Amino acid sequence: MTRQWETLREYDEIKYEFYEGIAKVTINRPEVRNAFTPKTVAEMIDAFSRARDDQNISVIILTGEGDKAFCSGGDQKKRGHGGYVGEDQIPRLNVLDLQRLIRVIPKPVIAMVRGYAIGGGNVLNVVCDLTIAADNAIFGQTGPKVGSFDAGYGSGYLARIVGHKKAREIWYLCRQYNAQEALDMGLVNTVVPLDQIEDETVQWCKEIMKHSPTALRFLKAAMNADTDGLAGLQQMAGDATLLYYTTDEAKEGRDAFKEKRDPDFDQFPKFP
């Protein structure tokens, strides 16, 4: 099925599009297998932030342009002393900010993977809530081969997903794994033919959109809290506070303060 994705904002190195409640963020550097630069990451952070705040968006897809690569990680040509060097000549690892944003954004994020998801590209796959893989997808880590590593989500959370032994194999040997192998180890949710991947991904989005956004928000926060320590608990606590603010009980406390009177909390139930 051909879809008319609406461009929400123009960027240089990514695409940010919308279709029937779904946002799609596409890394648009196919000439380098969608390797990211500091600018690519900054643009993705901006797009994801906009998707978070847009009440017309319920689910977000992350993908790469073309059929050959989802993302091959950081562009090694931009790697300098102390990080990846952007136009401002400051070395950065701002992809860590992007990883965290994908984790805390209160909407499901689905990785739609075609071709290579290697290095930092595989880590982006790992931090997404769900992964739909095409049958030509290839996954793996290359850090130790190129003098790099991800000691955060790319290793610790990966080990939660595939198991510690398998995660060590992935990092220590730097092998590549096909889509079926990724499915077998729990790295992806399903594998579909390449020409059907967008149809399948949109179908998953549509199913998700039928469900309670508040329930999904808390489920995501709860699952992340298990691995994100106090930062994860802070996110879940913040979500709980936002939900509480919508109740009559919270409004009574606010209104009493504004009206300079004592609040009447006795009117609210004390559930066991």
From Swiss-Prot:
The record marks 84, 245 as: Important for catalysis. Substrate binds at residues 33, 72-76, 84, 116-120, 142, 148, 245, 260. Keywords: Lyase, Menaquinone biosynthesis. GO terms for biological process: menaquinone biosynthetic process. Hydrogencarbonate binds at residues 141-143. It comes from the Bacteria. One of its GO terms (cellular component) is cytosol. Residues 253-272 are annotated as: Disordered. Its cofactor is hydrogencarbonate. Its EC number is 4.1.3.36. Pathway: Quinol/quinone metabolism; 1,4-dihydroxy-2-naphthoate biosynthesis; 1,4-dihydroxy-2-naphthoate from chorismate: step 6/7; Quinol/quinone metabolism; menaquinone biosynthesis. The keyword Glycosyltransferase does not apply. It catalyses: 2-succinylbenzoyl-CoA + H(+) = 1,4-dihydroxy-2-naphthoyl-CoA + H2O. GO terms for molecular function: 1,4-dihydroxy-2-naphthoyl-CoA synthase activity. Residues 253-264 have a biased composition (Basic and acidic residues). NCBIfam families: menB, PRK07396.1. Belongs to the enoyl-CoA hydratase/isomerase family. MenB subfamily. Converts o-succinylbenzoyl-CoA (OSB-CoA) to 1,4-dihydroxy-2-naphthoyl-CoA (DHNA-CoA). This is 1,4-dihydroxy-2-naphthoyl-CoA synthase. The lineage of its organism: Bacteria, Bacillati, Bacillota, Bacilli, Bacillales.
